Regions:
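Short, basic interhelical loop/turn and adjoining N-cap
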Residues: 203-206
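Ser/Thr-glycine-rich phosphate-binding loops at phosphate-binding pockets of nucleotides
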Residues: 161-167
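PRPP/pyrophosphate-binding module of the type I phosphoribosyltransferase fold
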Residues: 168-173
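Nucleotide/phosphate-binding catalytic cleft detector across ATP-hydrolyzing
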Residues: 1-157, 175-190, 209-302
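A contiguous pocket-lining binding segment that forms or flanks enzyme active sites
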Residues: 198
Length: 302
C-alpha cells in the first residue's frame, strides 16, 4: 500500500463523516487573516477556514463550488494521521450521492474530487496529497452493505434520515428497486428549525445541540417540564408524519426496515415506539461512509 489511502467519505449536508470515524459539522467560517482560535483551523490556498461553524447552504449539486472539497480536507488529514503517513499521500476516495440524482451527478461528482498536488495545513500540521481516484456509490444502499448478509435474500425498506432530506427505497434480494427511490425534503434540520420557532413564541432560545440532547433524553440545561414536553410532542409528530408519508409511497412496514443516517439515530426512541414499524434495524451515522469504503475495496479488487 505504501503511501496509498482508501477512504470512505460521506459529505452530508449536516455533517461530514468518514469510514475511519471522523465527524465534523458541515460548515466553516472563512477569513483572509488568521483567526484568534487555531482550533480546527484549515489553511488552504492562502485562506483560513474555521471548520465546524456556519453550516453550509444546502446544495444538491455539491460541485458548484469548493465548499464540499474544503470540508473534505480535514477528513482526509484525519485519515493520513491514522495511517501515520508523513510524506505525500495518494488518496482514493469512495463517496456517495442520493439515489434520486445518482445517475445524473455521478460523473461530475467523481471528477470534482480528482486533484493532484494538493497542499494544505490543518491544526498546525502540513499535508500534501494526490487524489488519484474517486468512486461514487448510492447513498443509503452503501450503508446497507455493512449488514448485507442479513438482508441479501429478503425484501426490506431502507430509510436514510439526513440533515435536509429523507431518502427512501426498497431492496429485494440485494438489488435496489429503482422505481421505489424517493427523496423527501423533510430532514432532521426541518424538525429542529420548527422546534426553535415554536419555542421562540415563549422567548426561549435553544441551540440545535440543546434540542438534540433533549430529544435524546439528556439534560443539557435545566428547563421547565413544558419545554421538554413541547419538544417531545413535536418530535413524535414529525416521526409519525414521516412514516405516514413513506406509507403513502407504497412502503409496507411489515417488511424489515433499515434506518440509517444521523437523523435515524437521533430519532431511534421515537421510531421504536411507533406502532407503524414492525421491525427496525438502526445503523449508525458512519454506516454510509463505511459502506463506501467496503464498495471501494471490492471494486478495486476486481
Amino acid at each position: 500500500m505504501g503511501n496509498r489511502i482508501l477512504l470512505g467519505l460521506d459529505n452530508g449536508n449536516k455533517c461530514t463523516k468518514t469510514s475511519e470515524g471522523y465527524i465534523a459539522e458541515s460548515g466553516f467560517t472563512k477569513s483572509n487573516s488568521e483567526p484568534i482560535s487555531a482550533s480546527n483551523l484549515l489553511i488552504y490556498e492562502g485562506k483560513f477556514y474555521s471548520i465546524g461553524g456556519n453550516r453550509l447552504s444546502v446544495q444538491m449539486d455539491k460541485t458548484v463550488n469548493q465548499d464540499t472539497f474544503i470540508m473534505s480536507l480535514p477528513a482526509i488529514a484525519d485519515a493520513v494521521n491514522i495511517a501515520r503517513i508523513e510524506d505525500k499521500s495518494d488518496v482514493i476516495l469512495g463517496v456517495g450521492l442520493p439515489i434520486v440524482n445518482y445517475g445524473t451527478l455521478k460523473k461530475k461528482f467523481r471528477e470534482y474530487f480528482l486533484r493532484q498536488d494538493v497542499k494544505f495545513n490543518f491544526n498546525k500540521k502540513g499535508y500534501a496529497i494526490n487524489i488519484i481516484d474517486c468512486r461514487v456509490y448510492p447513498q443509503g444502499y452503501a450503508s446497507l452493505i455493512t449488514v448485507f448478509n442479513s438482508y441479501k435474500d429478503i425484501l426490506c425498506n431502507v430509510i436514510d434520515i439526513g440533515g435536509y432530506t429523507v431518502d427512501i427505497f426498497r431492496v429485494e434480494n440485494g438489488i435496489i428497486d429503482t422505481a421505489s427511490c424517493y427523496s423527501l425534503p423533510d430532514g432532521i434540520i426541518t424538525l429542529i428549525a420548527n422546534i426553535q420557532q415554536e419555542l421562540l413564541k415563549t422567548n426561549i432560545r435553544l441551540t440545535e445541540t440543546q434540542i438534540q440532547d433533549i430529544i435524546l433524553g439528556r439534560e443539557p440545561v435545566i428547563f421547565e417540564a413544558d419545554v421538554k414536553e413541547i419538544i417531545k410532542i413535536m418530535t413524535n409528530e414529525y416521526v409519525e408524519n414521516i412514516l405516514a408519508k413513506i406509507e403513502e409511497y407504497g412502503f409496507e412496514f411489515r417488511n424489515p426496515t433499515v434506518f440509517t443516517g444521523g437523523g435515524s439515530m437521533l430519532l431511534r426512541k421515537y421510531i421504536e415506539e411507533s406502532t407503524k414499524v414492525r421491525y427496525a434495524d438502526f445503523l449508525d451515522q458512519f454506516a454510509n461512509a463505511k459502506g463506501y469504503k467496503i464498495l471501494l475495496e471490492q471494486e478495486l479488487r476486481r
